[in-house]
Amino acid sequence: MRRLLLSLLVIGVAGGLLPMATAQAKPKPATPAIRHIFVINLENTSYDETFGAASPAPYLSKELTAKGQLLSQYFATGHVSLSNYITQISGQGPSKATQVDCATYSDFVATGTGDLGQVLGDGCVYPASVKTIADQLTAKHLTWRGYMEDIGNSATEPKTCRHPAIGGPDPTLAARPGDMYATRHNPFVYFHSIIDTPTCAKNVVGLDALTADLAKPKTTRNLSYIAPNLCHDGHDHPCVDGQPGGLVSADAFLGEWVPKILASKAFKKDGLLVVTFDESEIGADSSDCCGPTPTPNVEQPGIQGPGGGRVGAVIVSPFVKPGTTSDTPYNHYALLCSMEDAFGLSHLGLAGRPGLQCFGNDVYNKKT
């Protein structure tokens, strides 16, 4: 995310044995019969900027919160962007390489496995033994898709499952006119368990596929993971195409796509929408919640502190009472364990940390 960090952090890669990352089992709170989860990640904005009185995002901060619940104490897990996305789907903490957004798309060279399935070593693309919630869903005969805006806009790159060659530079660190896709906002392509199989081309697709998939419950994936482009997620401001970017463009994106999700039969029956941010602005907030989190590959997950800052999240669901607020501390690991609970899955990595609270009755507060 921040190129200046490349000169401040040195990526060390050590050789060793392939690890086996295991899922953890811990008591699960009562979870309603959620069968369709939609996750939308926006970029680099603090809680106060997004949800304060002067927010430039009225759809998110006012209209959408009125339809669901505001998680006022939701935190990112690190800086910079990529480590948070990887956290959300795998429970793996940051490496030195992911803390600088993997400007070089290198393999993660593993030296072993630590507590809670944390893979020891450094690099970007995890060995096939390291699993994600996508792998868990597939194993349970459930479905998933990553919807990546602009992934198919390059004239020379694949239209789906797009990523650099192993060992090569990432050409998507900066937006290009007509192509504002960012590899680092697509966590699925950082796992060999996905990119080395036909699953990737089938399931890591363009955002335009979402409309057709929402048409029927049977075509709506159990997990729909949505990443806007570098303008519509609020990362860039202004954008290369002249749009304002920031929260203004992010809010417009939500105003276009969220009503489609909320109107779908799958959502109305048993859906859960989560809108959050990958991290707060780096340098302004590196705070964390939810107790100490062991991250053996880096000293500070937030570079300057223990986390990625307070960002907030909005939850909308038939199982959530509109217009409510929860001040229970949550973070991206808690989001992962909550999604796994909904689908009856074990907890991967740090999503299985003892004492971490997954979504409970404070979130699922509406009787149906």
Predicted regions and their residues:
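Secretory targeting and sorting signals
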Residues: 1-25
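N-terminal pro-sequences and low-complexity stem/linker regions of secreted or lumenal proteins
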Residues: 24-368
